Amino acid sequence: GDQALRARHCSPQVDSALHYAAHFEVPATPEMSPANGVHHHPTASAQAFIAKVFPQWDAGLGLEVEDPAVELVCPGWTGAVVSKNAGDNKDRTLYVHMSTTTDRSQLREHMLAILDMASDRVAAGRVVFCLERSLPDLRSLLHGLCYVGGQATGAPGQRDPWIGLCPVTSLLLVTVNL
């Protein structure tokens, strides 16, 4: 390997560069995107996200949870993918939450990016938008989501039909089937 490469090159600079490159360690994946300063901690628990949305969440429900890195696609958003085994296939749902402090100037673009991510990269059958009931523009958000086929599925006291648990009372769940 290393000797054969050196035999083909007679330059000491090339030899030195090849030797250095052969022993170079690739750094770990960064936790911050240099493009926009967004932090992402892939080891942070998606279970914790789901437990905040569904206080009765129990990891023993037989559902798998993973981190889809929503905040890298849409800063200010968080989320988790929940998977159920359905025979030979996995039925997957992407749950997302927008912080109340999120910049709304790109809201439409972010929602479309989330829908694209869910169908393309995450292979989810639906996206559940977990909206804060206290949002000043909740009515217009609901209208926009209904326009793309969204349905309110998790009002306070109402079980989410997919997980079968009630969300915290501060959230309204809106499901868009893909």
What does each of the following model-derived ranges do?
Residues 136-152:
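Conserved active-site alpha-helix within GNAT-family acetyltransferase domains
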Residues 161-165:
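Ankyrin repeat (ANK) tandem arrays and their immediately adjacent linkers/low-complexity segments
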Residues 1-109, 113-117, 121-131, 151, ...:
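Non-catalytic substrate-recognition and accessory regions of acyl/acetyltransferase enzymes
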Residues 134-137, 170-174:
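Noncatalytic linker/hinge segments flanking ATPase motor cores
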Residues 129-140, 158:
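Conserved beta-strand-loop-alpha-helix junction that forms the acyl-donor binding cleft
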Residues 140, 167-168:
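Charge-rich, low-complexity amphipathic helices
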Residues 146, 155-157, 170-172:
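Intrinsically disordered, low-complexity, Lys/Arg-biased terminal tails
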